[in-house]
Amino acid sequence: MAVKIRLTRMGSKKKPFYRINVADSRAPRDGRFIETVGTYNPLVAENQVTLKEDRILDWLSKGAQPSDTVRNLLSKAGVMTKFHDQKFSK
């Protein structure tokens, strides 16, 4: 099973709000997911992002692939650097 970390759109028309979910890559964008690991609100001035870093690092170590947008959000939050250090420190 190929697992992706990607955004799921929530909110109403013209007011998007996103959850960062871990889901099977074959599932629809807003369909079934395994776990919610964060949120992203692009409408706030500083683009509010909340993350469960320990769960994200766990899923990345298990082989989950982040989407391009999620990879950018994780990089800005410093999670990808932690994952890289954790992976190559062995």
From Swiss-Prot:
Keywords tagged on the record: Ribonucleoprotein, Ribosomal protein
GO cellular component, one term: cytoplasm
GO MF annotation, one: structural constituent of ribosome
Disulfide-linked positions: none
Any Pfam family the entry gives: Ribosomal_S16
One Gene Ontology term from the biological process aspect of the record: translation
InterPro entries, alphabetized: Ribosomal_bS16, Ribosomal_bS16_dom_sf
Family per similarity comment: Belongs to the bacterial ribosomal protein bS16 family.
Protein name as it appears in the record: Small ribosomal subunit protein bS16
Organism: Streptococcus uberis (strain ATCC BAA-854 / 0140J)
